[in-house]
């Protein structure tokens, strides 16, 4: 915060609460107010009245950063220097111990058709069923690459994946999942053999995980109930 200096005792404990996305936007249903403006937030108002308020721009004025970048900045890191993507945070949160050379990804369980076109980017916001689906991927092996796949469920439709092996590169363009886009539209960001290999590894993982998930009993049951199957990662 510009112009604000707070001196804390070394022994002082701090509880940092980040209302990630809480500000939201004005809604017609709320008479042009944001959910926070319309809420009965007397406890928050009291805390604010007892403390000091300020304005903090994580990446500069007018820039709305993602959660990961914003939290890095709040904790005192320069995202422009240290940010490498969200996957590493997700892997750490899933208790995956990463090694040098590993690639980490934040993943969604999704619904695709047989040509890998995305139908639902969150598989109907699947919940605890995703735990069993993630377990079914624990023994997944890639036929054409000596690359280990570590996959863990994290929360709801979300998961974390780590690829471990030689000759992998982070220089791969992975677009955020969108409905009616192809799930396998990965592209190398440079002409290196490592980037091209990583693209092919990701495509093989996508197809291999689809082959496991599409016939999983949970997905057969979901389809029978008219729910979107979580048949892809």
Predicted regions: what is each one?
Residues 13, 23-141:
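Active-site nucleophile/metal-coordination loop of metallo-enzymes that catalyze phosphate/sulfate
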Residues 13-15, 54, 105, 157-159, ...:
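Structural beta-strand/beta-sheet cores of well-ordered domains, especially the beta-sheet scaffolds
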Residues 13-25, 46-47, 205, 221-224, ...:
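Beta-strand elements within well-structured catalytic alpha/beta cores of enzymes
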Residues 86-213:
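A contiguous, mid-domain pocket- or channel-lining segment that forms the substrate-recognition surface
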Residues 200, 210, 214-221, 225-228, ...:
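Long, well-ordered, tryptophan-enriched scaffold segments
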Residues 9-11, 146, 215-217:
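Short hydrophobic "helix-edge" motifs at membrane interfaces and signal-peptide entry regions
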Residues 7, 44-48, 99-101, 150-153, ...:
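A general structural signal for short secondary-structure junctions and capping/turn motifs
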Residues 1-11:
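Short, Lys/Arg-enriched N-terminal segments with co-localized hydrophobic residues
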């Amino acid at each position: 915060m510009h112009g604000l200096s707070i001196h804390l005792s070394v022994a002082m404990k701090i509880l940092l609460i980040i209302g990630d996305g809480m500000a939201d936007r004005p809604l017609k249903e709320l008479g042009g107010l944001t959910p926070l403006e319309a809420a009965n937030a007397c406890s928050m108002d009291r805390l604010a009245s007892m403390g000091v308020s300020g304005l903090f721009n994580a990446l500069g004025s007018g820039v709305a950063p993602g959660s990961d970048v914003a939290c890095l900045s709040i904790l005192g890191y320069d995202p422009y220097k240290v940010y490498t993507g969200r996957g590493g945070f997700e892997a750490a949160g899933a208790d995956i111990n990463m090694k040098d050379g590993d690639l980490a990804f934040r993943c969604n369980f999704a619904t695709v058709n047989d040509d890998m076109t995305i139908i639902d980017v969150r598989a109907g916001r699947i919940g605890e069923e995703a735990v069993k689906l993630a377990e079914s991927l624990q023994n997944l092996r890639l036929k054409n690459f000596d690359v280990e796949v570590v996959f863990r469920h994290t929360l709801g439709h979300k998961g974390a994946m780590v690829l471990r092996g030689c000759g992998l590169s982070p220089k791969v363009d992975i677009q955020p999942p969108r409905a009616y886009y192809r799930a396998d539209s990965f592209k190398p960001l440079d002409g290196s053999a490592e980037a091209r290999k990583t693209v092919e590894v990701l495509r093989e993982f996508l197809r291999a995980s689809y082959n496991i998930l599409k016939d999983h009993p949970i997905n057969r049951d979901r389809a029978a109930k008219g729910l979107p199957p979580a048949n892809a990662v």
